[in-house]
Design a protein with these regions (language model features):
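Conserved CoA-thioester-binding segment of acyl-CoA-metabolizing enzymes
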Residues: 2-87, 92
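A structural preference for short, pocket-lining loop segments at secondary-structure junctions
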Residues: 40, 45-46, 63-133, 137-144, ...
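Gly/Ser-rich catalytic serine loop of serine hydrolases
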Residues: 150-161
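Short N-terminal micro-motifs specific to bacterial/archaeal maturation
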Residues: 52-55, 98, 155
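Gly/Pro- and small hydrophobic-enriched strand-loop and loop-to-helix capping segments
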Residues: 154, 167-169
Length: 169
């Protein structure tokens, strides 16, 4: 059913749970498309697709969701921060950009499957808003939540603007 799907998509990913001990020890982790670093009691998640102005696509979504999960699962983290990495584009070179939404190059080339949108909206974006579900109870009754702050350098277009609506501050 729809409720079961929504609940399942809010559960922490198995690969994030497997990486949690490493993140707890080292305080940082890099994945394809994102990284996470603990700074004091804050976890900073940085979305990174520098060639495409940090646009979201099939290659960056998994890494971003893993980092969101880690920020929510980490017992030493009390607040989470989302930002974009430094980009390569000539006009913005050397500057952080929050994100350009969906990767329009991949969309044009037909490399953005329809189900990607569902996975993005029910996965990492929903987790920013609702937190992580627990397997034994519905998320509206018991979830792992932390406040999120967005650091918006440059711009947030399309899906990145949508992401801002799910973030607390």
């Amino acid at each position: 059913s729809g409720r079961h799907l929504c609940h399942a998509m809010l559960l922490p990913r198995a690969d994030a749970q497997a990486l949690l001990p490493q993140f707890e020890r080292e305080g940082k982790l890099e994945r394809n498309g994102a990284s996470i670093q603990r700074r004091g009691k804050a976890a900073v998640v940085t979305q990174s697709n520098p060639r495409f102005l940090n646009a979201e696509d099939q290659t960056s979504l998994d890494g971003a969701e893993i980092c969101v999960d880690l920020a929510l699962l980490d017992p030493a983290t009390e607040i989470a921060v989302m930002r974009g990495a430094v980009v390569e584009h000539q006009k913005y070179q050397g500057r952080h950009v929050f994100g350009a939404g969906i990767n329009l190059t991949h969309l044009y080339e037909g490399r953005s499957p329809f189900l990607w949108y569902l996975g993005r909206d029910l996965g990492p974006v929903n987790k920013l808003y609702r937190g992580l579900a627990r397997p034994e109870s519905p998320p509206e009754q018991d979830s792992i939540e932390k406040p999120w702050i967005a650091v918006v350098d440059g711009f947030a277009i399309g899906g990145h603007c949508q992401m801002l609506l799910a973030i607390d501050l």
